[in-house]
C-alpha cells in the first residue's frame, strides 16, 4: 500500500487513494456503517464552511455549530447510548412501582464511532472558535475523518495537526519508513507479548469471579492494568507507525503513564488525545479552574464522568470515570489547602508516590474490567477480605508474561527517566538490526496470536 501511495505521484491522486483505502478498511467490519462516517463527514464539513461564512452573524454562526453537534452526538447517542438509558429508565420506573416497557434497539455498535465523532466535532468547534480555517477540499477533509491508521481506535487527531499534512507533497524517506516500521514492531510486541498474554489469566479470573479468591483477583487486576495499557498503546504505536511510513505524524497518545506520581500527571500521560480533547471541549467551556473553587471541583467531576461515558454505555464505566474524577477532586483540594506539603517535589518522595498512584489506577481498573457494578464490588470485597489461593497456571505463562512486562517497563523507564536511545534506536545500524530481529523472534516465539481484538475497538 505504501508503494502504491508513493507511485501515484500527484498529491490529489494519493489523497483519493488513501480515502478509498480508508473506507474499504472500515467496510470490512460492517459495510452499511460507512454511511455513518460519510454522514458525519458531510455534516461537519458543510457546517464548518457555513460557520466560517457566518462570521458577521453570531446567531447564525452558533446555529450551524449547534446543528453539527446535535446531528453528530445524536447519531452517537442512538447507536451507543439509547439502550443504556432506556434500560436505566426502565429500572428506575420499576423501582418506583411503575410497570412501563421502554423499548430497546439492540443495534450493533459501529466500530470506532466515539473516535471519529469526537474528531469531527472537534473540527467544527475549532472552526467556530477561529482556531483553524474551514477546509474547502471535501476529499482532504473526508480523509481527515476516516484516515485508516487511526480511524477505529485513535488517537483522536486535531485538524490543525493532520489537515496540513494531507495538503503537503510527501516524498519517500527511508529513515521515516524505518521509524514507522520500528513503531509498528514495538506496538505488535506490546499487543502480542504483553496484552494478549496477560489476557489469558485476566479473562479466566474475571469471567468467573465467584470461583476465585482475592489473591487471584488482585493479580488479575494488576495484569489487566498492563493488558489495557499495552493493548491500547500498542494499537496507537501501530497506527502511528503505519502513518509514519507514508510521511504522516500522528500525535503521541501515551507517555509512560504508569510512572506518574499523581493522578493529574497520569491523565497527562494516558490517552493523551482524549484527555486533551475533554480539556479543550468540555472542561474549559465549563469554566475550568477560572471559577469559584467548588465549581472548579464540579467541573473536574463532570469532565471525568464524560470520560467514563465515552468509554462505554455501562454503569461500570461511569463508576470508573467517577473514581478518577474523585481522585482529581481530592488532589486538587489537597493542593489548594496544603500546598507543596501535599505533594513534595523531593525525588525520593516522588518515587514513593509512583506505586501509590499505580495502586489507585489499578483500583479503578476493577470497575473498568468488571461486567457489572455488582461484580466489581464482589472483586473489591474479595481482594480486601478473602485472600484465597492464587489461580494456578503453567510456568510458561508466568515466564512469558513477566518477561514481556519487564521489557516494557525497561523501555518506559528509559523513555521516562533515562538519556540516550535504546537498542531499536541505537546510532549503530548493526545494533538496530539485531534488536529488530530479536524483537521479531520474541513476538513469533512467545506472542499470543488469536482472534482477540483490540479492547478499544468497542468504543
Regions from the PLM with identified roles:
Residues 1-458:
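Membrane-embedded transmembrane alpha-helical bundles that form the catalytic cores
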Amino acid at each position: 500500500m505504501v508503494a502504491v501511495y508513493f507511485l501515484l505521484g500527484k498529491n490529489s491522486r494519493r489523497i483519493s487513494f488513501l480515502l478509498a483505502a480508508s473506507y474499504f478498511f472500515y467496510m470490512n467490519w460492517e459495510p452499511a456503517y460507512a454511511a455513518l462516517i460519510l454522514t458525519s463527514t458531510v455534516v461537519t464539513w458543510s457546517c464548518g464552511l457555513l460557520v466560517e461564512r457566518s462570521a458577521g452573524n453570531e446567531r447564525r454562526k452558533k446555529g450551524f455549530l449547534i446543528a453539527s453537534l446535535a446531528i453528530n452526538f445524536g447519531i452517537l447517542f442512538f447507536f451507543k447510548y439509547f439502550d443504556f438509558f432506556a434500560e436505566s429508565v426502565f429500572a428506575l420506573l420499576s423501582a418506583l412501582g411503575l410497570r412501563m416497557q421502554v423499548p430497546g434497539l439492540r443495534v450493533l455498535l459501529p466500530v470506532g464511532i466515539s473516535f471519529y465523532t469526537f474528531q469531527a466535532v472537534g473540527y467544527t468547534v475549532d472552526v467556530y472558535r477561529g482556531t483553524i480555517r474551514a477546509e474547502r477540499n471535501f476529499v482532504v477533509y473526508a480523509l481527515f475523518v476516516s484516515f485508516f491508521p487511526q480511524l477505529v481506535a485513535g488517537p483522536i487527531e486535531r485538524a490543525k495537526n493532520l489537515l496540513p499534512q494531507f495538503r503537503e507533497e510527501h516524498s519517500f524517506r527511508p529513515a521515516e519508513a524505518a521509524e514507522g516500521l520500528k513503531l509498528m514492531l514495538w506496538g505488535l510486541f506490546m499487543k502480542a507479548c504483553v496484552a494478549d498474554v496477560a489476557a489469558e489469566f485476566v479473562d479466566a479470573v474475571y469471567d468467573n469471579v465467584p470461583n476465585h479468591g482475592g489473591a487471584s483477583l488482585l493479580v488479575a487486576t494488576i495484569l489487566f492494568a498492563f493488558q489495557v495499557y499495552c493493548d491500547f498503546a500498542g494499537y496507537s504505536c501501530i497506527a502511528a507507525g503505519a502513518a509514519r511510513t507514508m510521511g504522516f505524524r500522528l500525535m503521541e497518545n501515551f507517555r509512560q503513564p504508569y510512572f506518574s506520581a499523581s493522578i493529574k500527571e497520569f491523565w497527562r500521560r494516558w490517552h493523551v488525545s482524549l484527555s486533551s480533547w475533554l480539556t479543550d471541549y468540555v472542561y474549559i467551556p465549563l469554566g475550568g479552574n477560572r471559577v469559584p473553587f467548588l465549581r472548579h471541583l464540579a467541573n473536574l467531576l463532570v469532565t471525568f464522568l464524560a470520560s467514563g461515558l465515552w468509554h462505554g454505555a455501562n454503569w461500570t464505566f461511569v463508576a470508573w470515570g467517577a473514581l478518577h474524577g474523585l481522585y482529581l477532586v481530592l488532589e486538587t483540594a489537597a493542593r489548594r489547602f496544603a500546598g507543596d506539603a501535599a505533594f513534595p517535589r523531593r525525588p525520593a518522595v516522588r518515587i514513593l508516590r509512583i506505586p501509590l498512584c499505580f495502586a489507585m489506577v489499578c483500583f479503578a481498573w476493577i470497575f473498568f474490567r468488571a461486567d457489572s457494578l455488582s461484580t466489581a464490588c464482589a472483586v473489591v470485597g474479595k481482594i480486601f477480605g478473602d485472600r484465597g489461593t492464587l489461580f494456578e497456571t503453567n510456568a510458561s505463562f508466568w515466564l512469558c508474561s513477566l518477561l514481556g512486562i519487564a521489557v516494557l517497563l525497561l523501555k518506559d523507564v528509559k523513555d521516562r527517566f533515562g538519556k540516550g536511545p535504546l537498542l531499536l534506536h541505537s546510532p549503530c545500524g548493526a545494533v538496530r538490526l539485531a534488536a529488530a530481529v530479536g524483537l521479531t523472534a520474541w513476538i513469533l516465539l512467545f506472542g499470543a496470536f488469536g482472534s482477540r481484538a483490540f479492547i478499544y475497538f468497542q468504543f
